[in-house]
């Protein structure tokens, strides 16, 4: 794989997180919109933590050469803790792919009236096919889809601002797993970053310089902020859609069928990019940990895609509200451990120089 610059890193960094929950408004509303004005502060805090930890993770990859989450978080020696990290990483990646597949099922049902399992099945097959191309295929997908995602989201945000004005919903946190805007922000940043380790960390060694790392993460955070701001503006302006499985699609449908179709395409692109990244990271990790699976490169991809489809039948909104917050709190512990590892590596380097 060739060296990449700040722009491609930024697109890949943002693309990992611009999934069904994010762009549909479901995830953003549950984590931030339900806290009213404080939710805005929560979003900014989450993106700050996500960006800082992202730069740290990529630089740690450049310093150590480690790609695997367990080694990046704990170093080369950690015994049973490394197995715990690997298990949680695999679980989180699987859950993300499952949530994205469930999102497509909800999209197919809400937009086209198709049974949810039909859309999910077709989507899982397409994701599996593209994921066989590996890391290079993932970067290509993000380079093509993320700019379009950002442009369409901003257009909807500007439209909502011009038509409805600026509005922030009242504070009404409905999820007991997120008791405050601070805990919601930390949970959001933690599970997103932990899920992205296996996807983003390997790009560190392909960066042109450490300055490119900082610039790329900054670009990615800017894209995430623009999309999140646009989505929250729209849902806050029409809170009656907040209870829908896909709030932003419901908002677009309330405006016109053409806009609903346009946003449906946007959601599909978002879900596709995130699903590909999750499946690539999941299968790469499995193959690194198992010689048997590494000898059969296609089998893990196809099997994981099939299992994600089966898990998606549980339902999109329920998965977002339960899986993400719970895994976010667990991931926060590992983010702290990765920071400690980075400090140790820098200290050792300073002693040698």
Protein language model features and the residues they cover:
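Hydrophobic alpha-helical segments and their helix-loop junctions in multi-pass secondary transporters
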Residues: 20, 94, 127, 148-174, ...
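Juxtamembrane transmembrane-helix boundary signature
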Residues: 44-71, 230-234, 238
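Hydrophobic, membrane-embedded alpha-helices of multi-pass small-molecule transporters
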Residues: 4-23, 42, 89-93, 97, ...
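Transmembrane-helix boundary/entry motifs in multi-pass membrane transporters
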Residues: 2-4, 34-40, 63-92, 110-114, ...
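Extracellular/periplasmic helix-exit of transmembrane alpha-helices
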Residues: 54-58, 166, 187-188, 220-251
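Transmembrane alpha-helical segments of multi-pass small-molecule transport proteins
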Residues: 6-14, 42-51, 55, 83-94, ...
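Extracellular loop-to-transmembrane helix junctions
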Residues: 2-7, 31-58, 214-226, 323-334
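Membrane-water interface regions at transmembrane-helix termini and the short interhelical loops
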Residues: 30-33, 60-63, 100-111, 124-145, ...
């Amino acid at each position: 794989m060739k060296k990449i610059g700040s722009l491609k890193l930024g697109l890949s960094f943002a693309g990992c997180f611009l999934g069904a929950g994010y762009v549909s408004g479901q995830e953003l509303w549950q984590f931030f919109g339900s806290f009213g004005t404080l939710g805005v502060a929560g979003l900014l805090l989450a993106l700050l933590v996500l960006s800082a930890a992202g730069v740290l993770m990529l630089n740690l990859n450049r310093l150590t050469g480690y790609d695997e989450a367990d080694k990046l978080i704990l170093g080369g020696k950690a015994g049973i803790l490394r197995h715990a990290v690997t298990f949680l990483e695999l679980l989180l990646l699987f859950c993300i792919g499952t949530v994205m597949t469930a999102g497509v099922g909800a999209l197919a049902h809400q937009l086209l009236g198709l049974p949810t399992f039909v859309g999910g099945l077709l989507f899982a097959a397409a994701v599996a096919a593209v994921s066989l191309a590996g890391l290079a295929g993932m970067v290509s997908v993000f380079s093509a889809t993320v700019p379009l995602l950002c442009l369409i989201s901003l257009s909807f945000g500007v439209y909502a601002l011009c038509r409805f004005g600026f509005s922030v919903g009242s504070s009404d946190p409905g999820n007991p797993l997120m008791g405050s805007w601070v805990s919601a922000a930390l949970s959001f940043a933690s599970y997103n970053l932990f899920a992205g380790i296996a996807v983003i960390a390997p790009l560190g060694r392909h960066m042109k310089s450490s300055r490119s790392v900082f610039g790329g993460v900054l670009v990615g955070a800017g894209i995430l902020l623009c999309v999140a701001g646009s989505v929250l503006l729209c849902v806050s302006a029409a809170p009656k859609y907040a209870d829908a499985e896909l709030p932003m699609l419901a908002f677009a449908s309330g405006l016109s069928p053409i806009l609903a179709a346009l946003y449906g395409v946007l959601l599909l692109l978002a879900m596709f990019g995130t699903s590909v990244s999750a499946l690539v990271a999941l299968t790469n990790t499995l193959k690194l940990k198992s010689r048997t699976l590494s000898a059969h490169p296609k089998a893990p991809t196809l099997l994981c895609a099939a299992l994600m489809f089966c898990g998606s039948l549980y339902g999109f909104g329920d998965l977002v509200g339960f899986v993400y917050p719970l895994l976010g709190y667990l991931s926060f512990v590992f983010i702290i451990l990765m920071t400690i590892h980075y400090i140790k590596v820098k200290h050792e380097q300073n002693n040698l120089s």
